[in-house]
């Protein structure tokens, strides 16, 4: 057996539900999209001189990579070394990140 509900009551219930939903959505804070801030490891910082040296000594516990480690058979040979110096990277206006500094650490 199917109940017959007057159309006006159905419309009244739907209108009430719509009004309640509209009020609830206006109470909730609107979320705006914004870019995420870079993590501590990805923030670029300009470091030079003793400041850069101190940071490298703190993060490179087992020491830094020497050019002899990178180019073991280059003694006596003329070869352009394309490895960028850490000061070339960090002591310029762009600065460097923690992850980039880790490339200069051993192991």
UniProtKB/Swiss-Prot annotation:
This is Insulin-like peptide 6. The keyword Disulfide bond applies. Keywords: Cleavage on pair of basic residues, Disulfide bond, Secreted, Signal. It is found in: Secreted. Belongs to the insulin family. One of its GO terms (cellular component) is extracellular space. It comes from Drosophila melanogaster (Fruit fly). Residues 67-76 form a propeptide. One of its GO terms (biological process) is positive regulation of multicellular organism growth. Disulfide bonds join 48-91, 60-105, 90-96. The gene is Ilp6.
């Amino acid at each position: 057996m199917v109940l017959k509900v007057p159309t006006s009551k159905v419309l009244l219930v739907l209108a009430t539900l719509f009004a309640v939903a509209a009020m609830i959505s206006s109470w909730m804070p609107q979320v705006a999209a914004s870019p995420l801030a870079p993590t501590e490891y990805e923030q670029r910082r300009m470091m030079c001189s003793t400041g850069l040296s101190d940071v490298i000594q703190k993060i490179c516990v087992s020491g830094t990579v020497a050019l002899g480690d990178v180019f073991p058979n280059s003694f006596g040979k003329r070869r352009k070394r394309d490895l960028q110096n850490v000061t070339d990277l960090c002591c310029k206006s762009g600065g460097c990140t923690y992850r980039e500094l880790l490339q200069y650490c051993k192991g």
